[in-house]
């Protein structure tokens, strides 16, 4: 996932107050959409109920209703909103998506095998609990502390109350570590009572991924997860690999032990583990875990009951499909003949050696097919969009439920392969330096005979069910004149039908969020922070200085020259120089003629440059921490932009 880069948790932070109006404005499926969705029932093996058996197998207990609140009474997690997910799919939801959404409703404590349990449906991700000789080993403590604590409490209500002795992060996405302080304290880790284990590169990946482009990712995450949509057959029904993400307190405790070599082993509280490193697959830092005494392979998030993202719609660096299939192939080679259970940190397990190999090889072959076929077509001269339109999985892969596109899609994953190897440019000079969207839109509309003419033709296309084209052509009218209510309404209607037909819930959410904002405008919400106190504490000085450079308003900085020294208590030193409208820094160096010198740790420096004005004023008053010209420091910080949280997407 999902994954803080997006902080998945940020997509739903108290911003659903407008859901009622969204539900009231939503329209029903057209006859064309209803027919398209009905046809899906004939295309896929709906008689295969194995996933339903597996998803409910080993169920012990759950909380009813599953509503989790924080200390102030605010809701952190609530599955009761999804009570509508019963019976057959309505016309407004693709039946394949409806099936997956029902499967993801399985929630509670599940016994996987003796000594191995999972809590599912308490967040987007799963918490895996291993019973050691004296205590518990927690794998991936969910997104927020509130749900992580509730998940552990559920376990304790049904199993012996033993202390947590270790926490393992399988990878660097927020839904796999953010709730850590709900199961252990920082003091327990610092004292050595609890080990925190992670793959090499975890901290750098977990922090950096959410900082430099964090604001843009957070805004786009609202679209990917359908944050403003009501949970209903007309709105958000699922997130593909879970229902949605929890709201609450996001935390991070740094690892005390790191896996640096493939097949490295640990014995934790009597439990032997072997780790398969998988960097650059689903996350920059990731690992799979072989548990020989349980004959169980934890595949982290590299094999789930869906095609995963090679590119995530909220935005991120594209992932390496070649590395991904090779990782799964190595898993089959290493453990396929020994594994009797496969678990993942999303969704439900697979039991039985034959089924496991079939599941893993199906996932492996899917990623390799998308990789190879996309490049095959690119080498024949097809552009990115043409590649995405042309790549189709063979039925031997496409008819496996675990290979359906509930998170990634063949279309946008094929584009990711193209992007990774070739990039954005089609090589057609017409695409080299096109007019920007608004200017081009005005020209398009003028060439097409004006907005009224375009709208008249778009209405005819809508009536024929040509929703993709209607959405595409009306973008020009909306960008040429965002006040054109008729264009906005018709484009919203087209988005809506596309959403209703989408098998992929993230596509559905994207379309329905676009329709929502065309009809309602952009909600007036405060900027969404992508950093918590724990995240800021984990930032390296270099990352913090890089982020300053990203925030620099180059117009304000034009012609300015400022030189600062930064000295940390541990002896680290940096120079910071503003010149030519860029911030350049160097480690292990000091200016002899600096305008000012700051003597403070990274957290204090972060408060100075990222905190509110009142906090800055308080820090600047401390003569013991800053010497020299404080005006220069103020001038530099005043040049740093505070990014708008809710920038335009479907309008210019």
Language-model region placement:
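Conserved beta-strand hairpin/beta-sheet module of binuclear metal-dependent hydrolase folds
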Residues: 102-162, 287-291, 295-301
